[in-house]
Amino acid sequence: MGRPRVLSGVQPTGALHLGNWLGAIRNWVDLQDTHDTFVCVVDLHAITVPHDPARLADDTLNTAALYLACGMDPQRCSIFIQSQVAAHSELCWLLNCVTPLNWLERMIQFKEKAVKQGDNVSVGLLDYPVLMAADILLYDADLVPVGEDQKQHLELARDIAQQRINARFGSEERPVLKVPKPLILKEGARVMSLTDGRSKMSKSDPNEGSRITLLDPPELITKKIKRAKTDPKRGLEFSNPDRPETDNLLGLYAILSGKGREAAADECADMGWGQFKPLLADAAVAALEPIQARHKELMADRVELDRVLAKGRDQAESVANASLERVRDALGFAKCS
């Protein structure tokens, strides 16, 4: 029996930030040694909302390069661009044809984003969860790393696989699609905004000061941390519900400095913010320096980056096409020799 397979990805819209790294990519790096790992840049999802076509290609390559710079190893995982594997779009259509409309209309993220877009909301945004289901189910993923905001989408993928495909077109002995399970991420999965300790750090936040991106220069990192929201109390502590910003910033320091929560809490127990913030800024700059240096090397060598992504695409296609063929057969499509 082979290693369990895991599939994950992130959109290329907006710059990747500390939350993406500490909450997701860092976990993917660890999974490479124990799991059959597929990681993709989900550029098809990026166009479900208004986007800038002049930036999409560069943003996609930048995101792929950051995966590699953060420690994803093409010798131990498959890194690819979603739109370069045609099976994603075809399986999405097949799943669309068996998925009830009301399943999609109840998705919380769709409701929230539809309010923002008003009459301009696209069918693609409504269908986003079905495309995500296709992404997952194509690779026979055993596990899918998910945060709180994606749990409902994974449940939909499981329901489509089990109730709409396997139950109708397969059998208990020979299911058409593997039903994935969620992989709960370890500590550090929720990095909060620098401007609101109760909100998750997000690429979509209009306030750029709310996040530290992986490519922010040292002076900008220092500036953002200096301006980060705090409280008037002296001394830093964890797990005080009345001090969410303190919990978030101290947690970042514990991770970025490598000291861990206990040592960080002891070190900062009597500190004021004027003493602590430079320490956090230095830790963030030092942690991101090797990532930024490696990213610069990769973006300067497009031939190598293209080679890695082409290899990942080929590996992904071999798995995805086999899964797609099973679904096509189960649904009764004709074959021509």
Swiss-Prot record:
ATP binds at Q11, P12, T13, G19, N20, G147, E148, D149, V191, K200, M201, S202, K203, S204. A motif ('KMSKS' region) lies at residues 200-204. L-tryptophan binds at D135. It is found in: Cytoplasm. GO terms for molecular function: ATP binding; tryptophan-tRNA ligase activity. Its main location: cytoplasm. One of its GO terms (cellular component) is cytoplasm. InterPro entries: aa-tRNA-synth_Ic, Rossmann-like_a/b/a_fold, Trp-tRNA-ligase, Trp-tRNA-ligase_bac-type, Trp-tRNA_synthetase. Belongs to the class-I aminoacyl-tRNA synthetase family. Homodimer. This is Tryptophan--tRNA ligase. It comes from Parasynechococcus marenigrum (strain WH8102). The lineage of its organism: Bacteria, Bacillati, Cyanobacteriota, Cyanophyceae, Synechococcales.
